[in-house]
Amino acid sequence: MRILQVIPVLDMAGAETMCQNLSVELHKMGHDVLVISLYTKETPLTENLRKNGVPVVFLEKKTGLDILCFYRLYREIQKFQPDVVHSHIYAGKYAHIAASAAGVKVKIYTVHNIAQKEATSSDQKINRFLFRRMGVVPVALSEEVRQTIVDVYHLDSKEIPIACNGIPMERCEPCSAYSKTATNYIHVGRFCEVKNHANLIHGFVKAHEQYPAIQLRLYGDGPLRQKMENLVAELQAQDFIHFMGLTDDVYSAMAKADVFILPSIYEGMPMTLIEAMATGLPIITTPVGGIVDMLEDGKEAAFTGTDPDSIAGSVSMLVDNAALRQSLGQTARIKAKQFSAETMAKKYLEIYSEGI
C-alpha cells in the first residue's frame, strides 16, 4: 500500500511524534510511506524518519492561507500516487482538497484532541465539509474523543473508527527498582496553556515546603516557557524546579525519574503518558479527554485536579509511599502493551483497507 502522511510541521510534540511512529511502523511492515510537512523545518523527527527509510518532503508553506501550497501538494500527490492520504491537525484542509482533486479515494484525518479544542471554529466548518461532503474519515484516539467528534460534527459514532496512539515499545527502559522515597518528578510537554504549567509549578512549590528533597524537571519548549521561567524565579524555586529544554531521548529522561506528572486541562491521548506507562513510572494526571480511557484511578495512575492544592496533595502522597508507586507503575506498564506502534499501525491498516 502507498500511504501519504500530511502534517503541518514535525515539531517535537504529541501529534507529530505519533505521525513519525506510525510512518516508521508502516514502513517496517513493507508499505511505501511518504511524509509531507507543510512548513519547512528540520527536527529530530525528520531526521529519525529519514534514518528509518521514510522520506520527508517540505512544501515551504507561508504563514496564513497559502494557495500555492494546495498546488504543490497536488503535484506531490500526483507524483507519489498514494492509495491513502492521511492528515493530522490542521493539514486536513490542504491535504484532502488536494487529494480529492487528484482522485485519491481513501482520505483519513486523525483528530488528535477533544474536537472542541482540536480546531478553530473556522476550521471546524471546513472539517464538517470534509467529513460530510468529501468522504474524509475522522479517526478518534479514544471513546471519549469519539464522543466529542459526534458532539461537534454531528456524525454517527459508527462513522468514526478508533485507533489508539502507539509508541515503539522496544525503545523503552522499564523501571527495574522503585526507590524508598520519590524525589525526582518529571513533566514532558509543550509550554502552552493546556499543559497547566503555572498550577503545576505552584503546586510543586507547596509540596516542596513539606518535602524539601523533591525536584521537578520540565522537558519541552513552547510559547509560555519564558513566562514559566519567570514564575519559578519569582517563587525562588530555581534550586528544585529545572527547565531541561527539548530532548530526543525521552525514554532515558524518564528512566532517571521516580514519578511522571501531567496535570493538563484537556488532552486527547498524550504520547508522553504512553511513554511513561511503558517505562513503568507511577503517574499523576488529570482525568480529562482520552486519559480516562487509558488509565484507571488508583490502579494505573493517581488522578488529580488541575488546581495547585490538588497537585500538591498528589505529589506529596507519592513521596514516601513506595508500595503505591510500584503498584501504579507496574500496572500501568502492563496496560501500556495495548499502545504499541505495531498495534496502532495494524489498526490504521484496517481503516485504510476498508476504504479501498
Where are these regions (language model features)?
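Aromatic "clamp/platform" in nucleotide-sugar-dependent glycosyltransferases that forms part
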Residues: 246, 265
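Conserved acidic donor-binding segment of nucleotide-sugar-dependent glycosyltransferases
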Residues: 297-309, 317-322
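Nucleotide-activated donor-binding/catalytic signature segment of Leloir-type glycosyltransferases, i.e.
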Residues: 229-245
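A short, well-ordered alpha-helix in the C-terminal region of glycosyltransferases
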Residues: 310, 317, 324-338, 347-350
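Short His-centered aromatic/hydrophobic patch
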Residues: 87-94, 111
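Short hydrophobic beta-strand element within catalytic cores of glycosyltransferases
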Residues: 282-285, 295
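Conserved donor-binding/catalytic core segment of Leloir-type glycosyltransferases
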Residues: 4, 178-195, 201-204
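Acidic anion/phosphate-binding donor-loop and adjacent secondary structure
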Residues: 64-68, 147-152, 157-182, 192
